[in-house]
């Protein structure tokens, strides 16, 4: 079977979920200048064709720098914000205007044999961003550099309702007719908040947020962001992360940071369970909870391969349905990726930890430890003093977590009478 068939099947829930949602996408000037820009445009057109309401915000910093260099003007910054004098503003207007026209032209392409054939998009931009001057900070006059005051929510939504892609540039206008140079991150964040967007998607050079070892941080809560900002210091990755967290605090459900250099990064982030960048979200992307009857199918998908390998004791659907209240599960984007069960043992202060299983693709994220802690807490709440576990393959894992070797003789009689000598499981116990 072709690989794309499986991909479409796995992507179909996301295709349905994203339809009629509002996404604000921020692409910095470096991303527009990158060779992968054409692929990003194709991916945006695909999102539009799938019913996503798109607002695209572009940056222009390198393009402005180029104009300044041509005129022999030295750029000035304070706190990584450009100081925009009159000469610089002329360069900003020139660069932004030309870049906006270039993006509109790319989105308007209708080339035979291209991903955009027949798309016939309508791209609209205008004076929908009202701005005000930053003014003087720490004795520095930012002059024509401004900040977003508001966006025209009704006007933009009307365009989105009519199936336009709305293109926002990093320029804002005051009621008195002044023009202000804006940070595209500020425009995108405020647009996402004011439009009550479902997602804010921020493009950067990196795959997403990387930790101290260079590993991708896949998910964060807004309250976890300040610690990472302190570690990152003053760099563009920190700006993106700060914008993502601000949007979430402002009511945007999810913010994503993806790479403009990686072909297909946007689609991977939106249409696969684990994505390819960093997600900042108020709600939990992955949830540890008590199992419900609706989870039986997902539990069977998880444990059946392990039963076939002899790692777990076989359980029929009927048994799972009857014992579902004993289970705790880890759910990730609707998929049950881990489980464990607690069985109190009659006429004793003991319980059995059973059916601890983690999807092979997620075995290095501490989910087993998380479930073990949850089971131990449940056991304590039930007055259980000793926790038993029977295993054939994972003895060392339990030993490393405080379980001691035990025997059938140590099992309460109600459980000892059910011991399967043919399976010959090793027995461990832990005082809790």
Swiss-Prot record:
Give the main location.
Answer: cytoplasm
What's one GO BP annotation on this UniProt entry? L-arginine biosynthetic process
Any one Gene Ontology MF annotation carried by this entry is: L-glutamate N-acetyltransferase activity
- Which InterPro entries does this entry report, sorted A to Z? AceGlu_kinase-like_sf (IPR036393), Acyl_CoA_acyltransferase (IPR016181), Asp/Glu/Uridylate_kinase (IPR001048), GNAT_dom (IPR000182), NAGS_kin (IPR033719), NH2A_AcTrfase (IPR010167)
Q: Per the UniProt record, which EC number(s) apply here? A: 2.3.1.1
The transmembrane residues are none
Instruction: From the Swiss-Prot or TrEMBL record, state where the protein is found.
Output: Cytoplasm
Q: Name one GO cellular component term.
A: cytoplasm
Q: What SUPFAM superfamilies is this protein classified in?
A: Acyl-CoA N-acyltransferases (Nat), Carbamate kinase-like
Key words of the record: Acyltransferase, Amino-acid biosynthesis, Arginine biosynthesis, Cytoplasm, Transferase
CDD domains documented for this protein? AAK_NAGS-ABP (cd04237), NAT_SF (cd04301)
Biochemical pathway: Amino-acid biosynthesis; L-arginine biosynthesis; N(2)-acetyl-L-ornithine from L-glutamate: step 1/4
Origin, by domain of life? Bacteria
Q: Which reaction does it catalyse?
A: L-glutamate + acetyl-CoA = N-acetyl-L-glutamate + CoA + H(+)
PROSITE patterns found in the cross-reference section? GNAT
**Residue span(s) of domain N-acetyltransferase:** 286-425
Tell me yes or no: is Transferase among this UniProt entry's keywords: yes
Q: Anything else of interest in the record? A: A functional ArgA is critical for the production of the phytotoxin syringomycin and, therefore, for pathogenicity in plants.
Per the record, the similarity remark reads: Belongs to the acetyltransferase family. ArgA subfamily.
Q: Which PANTHER family match?
A: AMINO-ACID ACETYLTRANSFERASE, AMINO-ACID ACETYLTRANSFERASE NAGS1, CHLOROPLASTIC-RELATED
> What is the recorded name of this protein?
Amino-acid acetyltransferase
This protein's gene is called argA
């Amino acid at each position: 079977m072709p690989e794309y068939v499986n991909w479409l099947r796995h992507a179909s829930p996301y295709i349905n979920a994203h339809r009629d949602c509002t996404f604000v996408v921020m692409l910095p000037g470096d991303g527009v200048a990158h060779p992968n820009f054409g692929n990003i445009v194709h991916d945006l057109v695909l999102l539009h064709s799938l019913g996503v309401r798109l607002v695209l915000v572009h940056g222009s910093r390198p393009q402005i720098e180029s104009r300044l260099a041509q005129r022999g003007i030295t750029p000035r910054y304070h706190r990584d914000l450009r100081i925009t004098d009159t000469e610089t503003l002329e360069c900003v207007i020139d660069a932004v205007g030309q870049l906006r026209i270039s993006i509109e032209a790319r989105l308007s392409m209708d080339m035979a044999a291209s991903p955009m054939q027949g798309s016939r998009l309508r791209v609209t931009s205008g004076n929908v961003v009202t701005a005000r001057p930053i003014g003087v900070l720490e004795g520095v006059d930012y002059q024509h550099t401004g900040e977003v005051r508001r966006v025209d929510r009704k006007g933009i939504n009307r365009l989105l309702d009519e199936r336009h892609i709305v293109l926002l540039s990093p320029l804002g206008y005051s009621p008195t007719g002044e023009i202000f140079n804006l940070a595209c991150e500020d425009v995108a964040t405020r647009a996402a908040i004011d439009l009550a967007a479902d997602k804010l998607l921020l493009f950067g050079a990196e795959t997403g947020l990387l930790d101290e070892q260079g590993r991708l941080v896949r998910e964060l809560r807004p309250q976890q962001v300040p610690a990472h900002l302190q570690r990152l210091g003053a760099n563009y990755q920190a700006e993106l992360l700060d914008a993502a967290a601000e949007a979430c605090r402002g009511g945007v459900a999810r913010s994503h940071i993806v790479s403009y250099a990686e072909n297909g990064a946007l689609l991977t982030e939106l249409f696969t369970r684990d994505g390819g960048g960093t997600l900042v979200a108020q709600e939990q992307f992955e949830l540890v909870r008590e199992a419900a009857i609706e989870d039986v199918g997902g539990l069977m998908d998880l444990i059946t391969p392990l039963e076939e390998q002899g790692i777990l004791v076989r359980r029929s659907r009927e048994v799972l349905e009857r014992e579902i209240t004993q289970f705790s599960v880890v759910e990730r984007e609707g998929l049950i990726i881990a489980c464990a069960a607690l069985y109190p043992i009659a006429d004793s202060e003991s319980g059995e930890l059973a059916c601890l299983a983690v999807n092979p693709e997620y075995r290095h994220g501490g989910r087993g430890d998380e479930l073990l802690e949850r089971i131990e807490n449940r056991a304590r709440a039930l007055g259980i003093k000793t926790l038993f576990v029977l295993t054939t393959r994972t003895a060392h894992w339990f030993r490393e977590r405080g379980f001691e070797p035990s025997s059938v003789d140590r099992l309460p009689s109600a459980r000892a009478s059910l011991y399967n000598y043919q399976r010959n499981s090793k027995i461990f116990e832990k005082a809790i």
